[in-house]
Amino acid sequence: MTKELLRALPKIDEILGIFNEDFLNENGRETVVSALRDIINENRKAILNEEVDYALTKEEAKSKCEHRLLKKRERNLKRVINGTGVVIHTNLGRSLLSKEATEAVALAASSYSNLEYDLKKGERGSRYSLIEGIIKDITGAEAALVVNNNAAAIMLVLNSLCENKEVIVSRGELVEIGGSFRIPEVMNFSRAKLVEVGTTNRTHLYDYEDAITEETGAFLKVHSSNFKIVGFTKSVSANEICNLAREKDIPVIEDIGSGVLIDLSKYGLEKEPTVIESLESGVDVVTFSGDKMLGGAQAGIIVGKKKFIDKIKRNQLTRALRVDKFTLAALEITLKHYLNEKEAIEKIPTLHMMTLDLKEIEERANRLYKNLEGLNKFYKFSIEEGESTVGGGSMPDSKLSTYLLRIDSDSINEVNLERELREYKIPIITRVYKGAVYIDLRTILEDDYEVIFNALKEIGEK
């Protein structure tokens, strides 16, 4: 039986003969032959191991080959629909760019640019000059620098200003920022020496003062943006540390994390320290992210006093951590939105989603509900009140009121429906709880409605 099956396996040339010539030209004859060999070898191995009792036909081998090569050509990084209500969803790419920022990236990608060319002088320029001015205008800082993420920013600052020196930081601020990436480890790589003061829940100004030695290089303050310590607590403000630092002639570095540029508490959100407030309190160097609350591209932005920023710019690590033209293009336009606060709220998707009026979200939910009326034979839809979150390790206490579309079905349970939606050609990421699938309308975009309808229709018709 085994020998007969092995003899029945089709030859590569025979299978190639039934392929469309256009398919062979599009994929490359060698690529098709290689895929066919793998498919036939897999079938042969399965026959020998008595795992199957059949030999593929020419047509079956051809079909498998076409499917395999089609999958190989698919993008690994693809568009997904965020139905979770987590605005800055770390796993789904964090912040979305505004239309104008997206266009700027496309222009930078499709044409030559003055990335490092001074158009006035007709000679080599600096990529950082393209964006330093707008950062200074918005924050009031004397100087600025952009690197590829905030962890890189804090490491570069510490290495530039505090190599082989002691850096004093509260134990309650020795945070982990995700992916097991911890402030003590970052400090270790920077070759600065960590000096912990206070306790996890209580640190006093005298703890900082008592830790000062001749080897002290800086005070470091880290905003605990992804958690809260409540109850019997005491922390020292940046303003208090800066007053002490001025007396002792010691620089102050602050990592404020999410990069809030405007006071969002006026829009009903949790109060977060802004970059401007940090600088106004007297902090010498501030670092923050570009792709969280700021709403731009992934970047680590360093602002502060010119004498310190200039020293950081001269560090050899700066070149290793520099950003590319796409990041600069996206960040420049995002920052220019902030020249007008109203424009920033309206045009930057992250800010717009976070500050959405509840009535508008309800209107979105009703619109989706009506769009799906034709699928009532497959599902039962209902609208419920719920809560969204900011995400991105920001505002852990903030719960944003929202409206959810609940999806129930008699023919498919919530676990399988969630999986089917997640594995759809344009994946739809949802919430599952209370025995149903939910879509949070806060994070649904204009182009998502049709995809959701088509996905649910195809799943229902299976």
Curated annotation (Swiss-Prot):
Cofactor(s) required, per the database record: pyridoxal 5'-phosphate
Catalytic activity as recorded in UniProt: L-seryl-tRNA(Sec) + selenophosphate + H(+) = L-selenocysteinyl-tRNA(Sec) + phosphate
GO BP: any one term: selenocysteine incorporation
Modified residues (N6-(pyridoxal phosphate)lysine): K292
Signal peptide: none
EC numbers for this chain: 2.9.1.1
GO annotations of cellular component type: cytoplasm
Pathway per the UniProt entry: Aminoacyl-tRNA biosynthesis; selenocysteinyl-tRNA(Sec) biosynthesis; selenocysteinyl-tRNA(Sec) from L-seryl-tRNA(Sec) (bacterial route): step 1/1
SUPFAM superfamilies (UniProt xref): PLP-dependent transferases (SSF53383)
Domain of life: Bacteria
Role noted for this protein: Converts seryl-tRNA(Sec) to selenocysteinyl-tRNA(Sec) required for selenoprotein biosynthesis.
Protein name: L-seryl-tRNA(Sec) selenium transferase
Encoding gene per record: selA
